[in-house]
């Protein structure tokens, strides 16, 4: 789920810069392939599983100097037999360089092979629409996102900040922070018997702090290790603590790490 709507501001603003250049008469379709590992799969502050391997394929096409259409398919699977968690996401988005900011709108379909919470608990699918705005504010990049989930009829708002520091010609350090907020019970409380969302409150979900180290291996390939720390808000404390109590791997406040490889062509 996270790779659909948690695009970093750096990526969005880079796309905007490219959009300002003159587009060719027939813009080609650009593809990217990614694969990675997460020690913990945490999405929007909620712990899902651990020891996850994931794969992503994306495609994008410039429709005009200022507009880009993109699609992607993302799959993640836990290698821990306690959760047996698997997820497939399919998404489409349209980004527009409005000058003052990069504006995006998208749709995502989520399929949960063994239930939203794994182990057969929870719904098997969800779908959402979202809008976001990305802009450089002073020394940092900022992205504001709001998404509405049709399955639970609740929304999620997020503010993300990131700053990149060049280390060498091929390596940079990216420091990022995110804060999420549930609007109307966005997966804030679950029925213990069915795993279905029964939350209704509007509360903070989490704060996420992350440091990543993108390393350019070539002009088209990048390797990125990262470390992160998730701090549960009121909308995540009970669920994440329950995963910890069940000895599944989740914690209220949790350190995790991972790495990914990405190639574009």
Model-identified regions with their sequence ranges:
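Short stretches within intrinsically disordered, low-complexity N-terminal or propeptide regions
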Residues: 16-19, 135, 223
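Flexible, solvent-exposed coil segments and beta strand-coil junctions
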Residues: 34-38, 67-73, 135-143, 189-194
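Short glycine/proline- and aromatic-enriched beta-strand/turn motifs that initiate or cap beta-hairpins
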Residues: 22-64, 68-79, 262
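Cleavable N-terminal export/targeting peptides
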Residues: 1-30, 66
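Outer-membrane beta-barrel translocator/channel fold
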Residues: 75-83, 106-129, 138, 145-156, ...
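Outer-envelope beta-barrel architecture signal
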Residues: 25-33, 51-53, 65-69, 88, ...
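Mid-chain, structured segments of secreted extracytoplasmic proteins
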Residues: 74-106
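Residues on the lipid-exposed face of transmembrane beta-strands in outer-membrane beta-barrel proteins
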Residues: 35-37, 55-61, 90-96, 107, ...
């Amino acid at each position: 789920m996270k790779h659909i709507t948690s695009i970093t501001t750096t990526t969005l603003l880079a796309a905007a810069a490219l959009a300002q250049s003159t587009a060719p008469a027939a813009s080609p379709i650009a593809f990217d392939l990614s694969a990675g590992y997460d020690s913990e799969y945490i999405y929007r502050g909620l712990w899902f599983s651990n020891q996850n391997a994931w794969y992503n394929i994306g495609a994008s096409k410039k429709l005009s100097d200022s507009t880009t259409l993109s699609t992607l398919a993302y799959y993640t699977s836990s290698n821990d037999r306690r959760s047996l968690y698997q997820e497939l996401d399919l998404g489409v988005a349209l980004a527009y360089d409005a000058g003052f900011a990069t504006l995006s709108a998208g749709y995502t379909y989520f399929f949960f092979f063994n239930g939203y919470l794994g182990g057969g608990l929870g719904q098997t699918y969800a779908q959402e629409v979202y809008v976001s705005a990305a802009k450089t504010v002073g020394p940092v990049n900022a992205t504001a996102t709001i998404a509405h989930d049709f399955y639970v009829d609740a929304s999620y708002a997020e503010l993300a900040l990131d700053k990149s520091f060049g280390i060498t010609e091929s390596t940079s350090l990216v420091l990022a922070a995110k804060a999420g907020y549930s609007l109307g019970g966005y997966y804030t409380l679950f029925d213990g018997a069915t795993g279905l969302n029964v939350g209704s409150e509007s509360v903070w979900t989490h704060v996420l702090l992350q440091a990543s180290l993108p390393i350019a291996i070539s002009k088209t390939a990048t390797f990125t290790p990262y470390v992160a720390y998730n701090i549960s808000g009121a909308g995540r404390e009970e669920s994440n603590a329950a995963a910890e109590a069940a000895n599944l791997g989740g914690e209220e406040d949790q350190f995790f790490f991972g790495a990914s490889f990405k190639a574009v062509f």
